[in-house]
Amino acid sequence: MLCCMRRTKQVEKNDEDQKIEQDGVKPEDKAHKAATKIQASFRGHITRKKLKDEKKGDAPAAEAEAKEKDDAPVADGVEKKEGDGSATTDAAPATSPKAEEPSKAGDAPSEEKKGEGDAAPSEEKAGSAETESAAKATTDNSPSSKAEDGPAKEEPKQADVPAAVTDAAATTPAAEDAAKAAQPPTETAESSQAEEEKEAVDEAKPKESARQDEGKEDPEADQEHA
């Protein structure tokens, strides 16, 4: 039995050796290779993160550099313009010294106007503040003042009523005369015709009364003769 066991063990070892020889790689080597692969992948992941961070950090720096480059030509242009403007201003006083005198004279009135304009709003504000304070004071004293003003207002009204009546009485005759004078000629003509008719009627009345008297006297005379 022991011999059989030894033989079987040898056969199993031989089978394992044959498999290793066929594969050409031992299990230890496989584990080592797997570990190296894992480490390599991990290292690659870390390096990628670093590269991304570096790119993100480089992007703002690149943008800042681009802005600086863009601003540089603009600043150069502004400096050139300022240089040209200063040159022209230097040339202007040299060529026209007389022009400065009117400009100075014009600046003086403008400064005076500015001073007046600044003083006017300040005065207006002070006046408005005073009016507001006065209005508040009057509103505070309004109940007592109203109570005092009540009888005082009634007395002037009563005094004004007879004066108005006397004025109306004095003006009525003058108003009638003015109305008569202002009447149109048609009304005056009608009034004159009415007066003439009245006079004719008045003249006719005594004649009729005389005729009636004569008629009465004739029958009486006839009766006497009879």
UniProtKB/Swiss-Prot annotation:
One of its GO terms (biological process) is regulation of growth. Induction: Up-regulated by kainic acid-induced seizures. Up-regulated after axotomy. Residues 9-32, 51-84, 98-127, 146-158, 201-214 have a biased composition (Basic and acidic residues). It holds the Pfam family IQ. Belongs to the neuromodulin family. The keyword Hydrolase does not apply. GO terms for cellular component: axon; cell periphery; cytoplasm; dendrite; filopodium membrane; GABA-ergic synapse; growth cone; growth cone membrane. Phosphorylated. Phosphorylation of this protein by a protein kinase C is specifically correlated with certain forms of synaptic plasticity. PROSITE patterns: IQ, NEUROMODULIN_1, NEUROMODULIN_2. InterPro entries: IQ_motif_EF-hand-BS, Neuromodulin, Neuromodulin_C, Neuromodulin_gap-junction_N, Neuromodulin_P_site, Neuromodulin_palmitoyl_site. Residues 1-226 are annotated as: Disordered. Expressed in hippocampal neurons, with highest levels of expression in the CA4 and CA3 neurons and lower levels in CA1 neurons. Expressed in the dorsal root ganglion. This protein is associated with nerve growth. It is a major component of the motile 'growth cones' that form the tips of elongating axons. Plays a role in axonal and dendritic filopodia induction. It is found in: Cell membrane; Cell projection, Growth cone; Cell projection, Growth cone membrane; Synapse. Residues 85-97, 128-139, 159-192 have a biased composition (Low complexity). Keywords: Calmodulin-binding, Cell membrane, Cell projection, Cytoplasm, Developmental protein, Differentiation, Growth regulation, Lipoprotein, Membrane, Neurogenesis, Palmitate, Phosphoprotein, Synapse. A lipid is attached at C3, C4 (S-palmitoyl cysteine). Residues 215-226 have a biased composition (Acidic residues). The modification Phosphoserine is found at S41, S86, S96, S142, S144, S145, S191, S192. This is Neuromodulin. It is a peripheral membrane protein. Identified in a complex containing FGFR4, NCAM1, CDH2, PLCG1, FRS2, SRC, SHC1, GAP43 and CTTN. Interacts (via IQ domain) with calmodulin. Binds calmodulin with a greater affinity in the absence of Ca(2+) than in its presence.
